[in-house]
């Protein structure tokens, strides 16, 4: 992904990106039920690397499974590429942790761009102080083995009622996380860029006392001309 496109998304709000996706017909791209652990560093951008959990079966998910160097969760932590965002499919179930501070720290040190789960993290009081964006539903102390069985990595998953394919673009801010399908990243970026500029313009006008009628949305011809004149000066 080109730096120019990255800059567009990193400067845009998740709300703006959601609207740009809706204009394309994609209305279910905002991951439901999650929020950032540390809102001071919640801006997040990266391609998706995924882990899929299924309900744990007691005879197959004993504590000893972590001794296997090929355990999917452990492999994922070591293979998630630099700048990618790890996304866990925990079936919206926070009764057991998707990961804890040691694994999240490892991903931070390896240079991952963030960690997202529709479940919960254990050691959340430690994770919120790490220098990596993290999003979850709520804290959860029990180990993942009690409820979640890691079954596959880097496959299509569901996270918070949103389909996430490997290499989809994951963008997060203080409100939450949106998923931009890989095949429309460039196309959506054009609308996101325009909307960000336009919304900044509108906010400045409204702060100075302007009415939103004819301005937001831009339906008044006089307001259109004013915006176009302002836009030409910016470029």
What role is predicted for each listed range?
Residues 1-166, 180-213, 217-235:
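Feature captures the catalytic cores and cofactor-binding loops of soluble hydro-lyases/lyases
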Residues 173:
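Beta-strand-loop-alpha-helix segment that lines the small-molecule cofactor/substrate pocket
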Residues 176-178:
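Channel- or pocket-lining gating/hinge segments that regulate access to a cavity or pore
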């Amino acid at each position: 992904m080109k730096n120019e496109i990255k800059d567009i998304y990193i400067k845009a709000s998740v709300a703006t990106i959601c609207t740009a996706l809706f204009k394309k017909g994609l209305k279910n791209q905002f991951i439901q039920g999650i929020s950032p652990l540390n809102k001071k560093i919640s801006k997040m951008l990266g391609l998706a690397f995924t882990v899929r959990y299924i309900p744990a079966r007691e005879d197959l998910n004993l504590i000893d499974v972590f001794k296997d160097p090929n355990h999917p969760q452990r492999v994922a932590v070591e293979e998630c590429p630099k700048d990618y965002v790890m996304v866990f499919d925990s079936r919206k179930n926070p009764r057991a942790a998707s990961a804890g501070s040691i694994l999240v720290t490892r991903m931070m040190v390896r240079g991952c761009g963030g960690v997202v789960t529709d479940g919960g993290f254990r050691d959340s009081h430690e994770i919120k102080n790490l220098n990596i964006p993290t999003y979850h539903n709520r804290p959860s102390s029990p180990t993942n083995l009690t409820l979640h069985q890691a079954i596959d990595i880097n496959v299509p998953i569901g996270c918070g009622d949103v389909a996430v394919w490997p290499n989809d673009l994951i963008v997060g801010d203080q409100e939450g996380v949106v998923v931009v399908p890989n095949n429309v990243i460039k196309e959506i970026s054009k609308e996101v860029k325009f909307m960000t500029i336009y919304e900044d313009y509108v906010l400045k006008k409204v702060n100075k006392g302007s009415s939103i009628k004819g301005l937001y949305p831009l339906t008044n011809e006089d307001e259109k001309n004013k915006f176009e004149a302002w836009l030409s000066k910016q470029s």
